[in-house]
Amino acid sequence: MQIIHTIEELRQALAPARQQGKKIGFVPTMGYLHKGHLELVRRARVENDVTLVSIFVNPLQFGANEDLGRYPRDLERDAGLLHDAQVDYLFAPTVSDMYPRPMQTVVDVPPLGNQMEGEARPGHFAGVATVVSKLFNIVGPDAAYFGEKDFQQLVIIRRMVDDMAIPVRIVGVETVREDDGLACSSRNVYLTPEQRRAAIIVPQALDEADRLYRSGMDDPDALEAAIRTFIGRQPLAVPEVIAIRDPETLERLPALQGRPILVALFVRVGATRLLDNRVIGHAAPQITQERAA
């Protein structure tokens, strides 16, 4: 595995693969890798000739009072995991490599990015869309892989790629979970043992939402209220966002009527925000399927 730190070096390294018509699979991350990231890597390796992973903690997607400074970082550890996973290239730029001057160009998808998690984290998804579009321009991948745990992010990136005619196939990969159901996340390391035990309320709330919906609760306001009450049984958990949405468009649904729905949760346990989602209903939604941009 070759570790690369600059944009120019990366472009030079990928040039032979492009000339040979090889397909490049790209997994953008912020590092401190876990089983979920490694599943993205596995899919990228299976479906492409060359696999590239980026590790970049992007300051544009963190708010003023968020965890940019303490976000877990361990490049040596991550490089070892990626080497073992047989990744071809690791791109690990610095902030000055990615943003040598203050950014004046912002990529934003306001209707999708200002709701749900974006309502709790203003500007977050503009930062995500900006860095992902820049990485796509740098790497020029044939396919890029994102976890469905960050479902809103996946919808936004798909829409950005469609709107901007970026020639990359966006692949959503099913959420990878710990043995007790908690979604794998780099931020799980923030949790104390007591908080970690409490955090199981998040996937349990999705199970409860699934049960209630399949048993006939099809009023979105009633379902949101029931989920909030369920999470309220755990005193260490504070629900910040509970949203029932269309999984294709993220639009609010006046009535559910048995259609597939997205249940999105954004729950604070201690000082840690935990994100989880599930699509439930009677049919698999299009957004969870691979499709070409």
From Swiss-Prot:
GO terms for molecular function: ATP binding; pantoate-beta-alanine ligase activity. Its EC number is 6.3.2.1. It is found in: Cytoplasm. The reaction proceeds by a bi uni uni bi ping pong mechanism. Catalyzes the condensation of pantoate with beta-alanine in an ATP-dependent reaction via a pantoyl-adenylate intermediate. Homodimer. This is Pantothenate synthetase. The gene is panC.
